[in-house]
Swiss-Prot record:
Positions marked as site (Cleavage): 188-189
Taxonomic path: Bacteria, Pseudomonadati, Pseudomonadota, Gammaproteobacteria, Pseudomonadales
A single GO cellular-component term on record: cytoplasm
Protein's recorded name: Arginine biosynthesis bifunctional protein ArgJ
Family statement: Belongs to the ArgJ family.
Entry coiled-coil feature ranges: none
Gene: argJ
């Protein structure tokens, strides 16, 4: 069940960025599970990657190659090529070499990405056999098809698009993502691809995707697990007839930053809305922190708590579980007598105790909604952070218990 996530919005084509989809039958015969993306010559490419120590073979290669000349991005679903050791690296290189051979580029110009089951050998021959069909399918209009092609346990494709005008020239930013479980990005299973036709230097582009991911992909969590394969890529094709952005300042940069951040936020929140088994979309706001980190610590303590997440699923306003999570978040010298907690607009705890105005009926009414905000006021300073998460349902357990069957 996707919470408040409807059909894909219009995904505007990005000049200089093409996508092609084909079937390798990695997990299911006939399933479109290979996506090739082609960047125009001269494009800048930047990315952020998982910090999981068991990062997948394609992540290792993509991190090594991203600052060089990049022409193609190759994604397969159904197999993560993680936990596969040196043979996994060999397999990832082979798929890149085959695509390079078919297109006449150097193998180092191909960045690989994989998502799916961890620990199984990558079916190289199947992927190689699907590459020509993906190349034949390349089109700037294939964003929606690619959004479907990168899905695993997702129930709906995810994408967003923005356009703005600068000096009479229209700039486009379009992105897609996948992910529904094993979601607590930290680079940053989550993959994101965003492209723009603006011309941007690689260093500025890298800072842009790092900051954009930090405020979006790095603020979502479904189950607290950081995948071995997480990455988010930002490509600037430079096809728009405007000067290159070489500094993080000025009206053009500011407009591009807003568009990129908006797309990041949309596709990141779409991952939460489509979380495995999710029936609630939950915003955890933490205000009044002494610093950003303690706000994040409190937010994640609440967002990761199985007791809170199951209470959300049951629409049970068990506010004591929220207080307990705040108390164990590790905030030094926390004065609980200054803490207020709200469910939606209802104050459920004031100065560390049940609010005198609170009734169970008020809490139950808020918890029955599909979209819920938990707001925590720490009373320690001026810092704030926001995390987005889900409830924890029977369906989440079922999906993950049956994942390999």
């Amino acid at each position: 069940m996707a919470v408040g996530l409807g059909p894909l919005p219009a995904l505007h084509p990005v000049p200089g960025f093409e996508l092609g989809i084909s079937s390798a039958g990695i997990k299911r015969p006939g399933r479109k599970d290979v996506v090739v993306m082609r960047c125009a010559e001269g494009s800048s490419v930047a990315g952020v990657f998982t910090l999981n120590a068991f990062c997948a073979a394609p992540v290792i290669l993509a991190k090594q190659r991203v600052q060089g000349t990049v022409r193609y991005l190759l994604t397969n679903t159904g197999n993560a090529n993680a936990g596969t050791g040196e043979p996994g690296l060999v397999a990832a290189r082979r798929t890149c070499e085959k695509l390079a051979q078919l297109t006449g580029v150097d193998a180092s110009a191909v960045l690989p990405y994989s998502t799916g089951v961890i620990g199984e050998p990558l079916p190289v021959e199947k992927i190689e056999g699907a590459l020509q069909a993906a190349l034949d399918d390349l089109s700037v209009d294939n964003w929606a098809a690619a959004a479907t092609g990168i899905m695993t346990t997702d129930t709906l494709p995810k994408g967003a698009s923005r356009q703005f005008t600068h000096d009479g020239v229209t700039i486009t930013v379009t992105g897609i993502s996948k992910g529904a479980g094993m979601i607590r990005p930290n680079m940053a299973t989550m993959l994101g691809y965003i492209a723009t036709d603006a011309k941007v230097s690689q260093s500025v582009l890298q800072d842009l995707i790092r900051d954009g991911a930090n405020k979006s992909f790095n603020r979502i969590t479904i189950d607290g697990d950081t995948s071995t394969n997480d990455c988010c890529m930002l490509i600037a094709t430079g096809q728009a007839d405007l000067p290159e952005i070489t500094e993080a300042k000025g009206p053009l940069f500011d407009a591009l930053k807003k568009a990129v951040f908006d797309v990041c936020m949309d596709v990141a929140q779409a991952i939460v809305r489509d979380g495995e088994g999710a029936t609630k979309f939950v915003t955890v706001e933490v205000n009044g922190g002494g610093n950003q980190q303690e706000c994040l610590d409190v937010g994640y303590a609440v967002a990761h708590s199985p007791l809170i997440k199951t209470a959300l699923f049951a629409s049970d306003p068990n506010w004591g579980r929220i207080l307990a999570a705040v108390g164990r978040a590790g905030v030094p010298d926390l004065d609980v007598s200054k803490i207020d907690v709200f469910l939606g607009g209802v104050c459920i705890a004031s100065q560390g105790c049940r609010a005198t105005t609170y009734t169970e009926e008020q809490g139950s009414a808020v918890m029955a909604e599909e979209e819920i905000t938990i707001r925590i006021e720490l009373g320690r300073g001026d810092c704030s952070e926001t995390i987005w998460t889900t409830d924890l349902s029977h369906e989440y357990v079922k999906i993950n218990a049956e994942y390999r069957t």
